[in-house]
Amino acid sequence: MIIFPAIDIKDSKCVRLIKGDFDKMTSYENSPFDQAKIYFQSGFRNIHIVDLDGALEGRSSNSNIIKQILKNLNLKIQIGGGIRTIDDVNNWIKSGVDKVIMGTAAVENIDLLKTVCERFKNKIAVSLDVKDGFISLSGWKKQTNISAIDFVKKIENFGVSRIIYTDINKDGTKKGPNIKDTVELSSKVKIPFVISGGISSIKDIKKIKSLNDSNIEGVIVGKSIYDGDIKINELAKQI
């Protein structure tokens, strides 16, 4: 199972949100590059990065910071936030990212998703931000009436390399992930899932690992690292 430490970037800073609420945002001292370096030096090789400015504005405004990380650290990065066009996807892949995460654009333009999956094989991940079973878009500002299960079924044969499933009700709360819903949804399709939102302890990580579920590819850990609830060296032992 892959453990993805997270870096969320807004206004060139590392931040975390609670339940996707930008009014409940905490900024942290370390720069995104310094944080990535800490992860790298601790033994992590897979990093989850979200450009929150990009998610809100529909275009990446922190790309130079992310490219600095790519250039200087030997990391496999999955990048999301503001990726809405084929050019966006192409630019990130040329920059050297491992996976490009499509969220809003994947849901609003399913033909685009199909096209990029065909063109960039095994490079496209889809981020599903889910609240009460329904997908949210645009940095969680827009709630839809599209059910997560219906959407996942629709894209099952496109060639999506992984689905990042975030339960917005759990995200940033450190109250434990929504393992039940993620496992249930992942069992219905052939696409690997990554669990995101609410990880609060090493115990949560061990619980997910103990499932030994081939449909669960990994887990994203964010706020609990920044707040010191999970120590990096302890998390590294779970790699």
Tell me the role of every PLM-derived stretch.
Residues 2-6, 46, 74-78, 99-101, ...:
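Structural preference for beta-strand elements that scaffold enzyme active sites
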Residues 46-64, 104, 109, 165-175:
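Glycine-rich, proline-tolerant flexible connector loops at the mouths of alpha/beta enzymes
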Residues 60-67, 110, 141-150, 175-184:
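Charged helix-capping and loop-helix junction motifs
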Residues 73, 77-98, 180-215, 235:
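Catalytic cores of alpha/beta
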Residues 111-119, 209-239:
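C-terminal helical cap(s) of enzyme catalytic domains, especially alpha/beta-barrels
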Residues 8, 39, 47, 92, ...:
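Conserved, mostly hydrophobic/aromatic
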Residues 12-15, 19-23, 97-171:
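Conserved anion-binding
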Residues 41, 48-95:
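N-terminal active-site wall of soluble small-molecule enzyme domains
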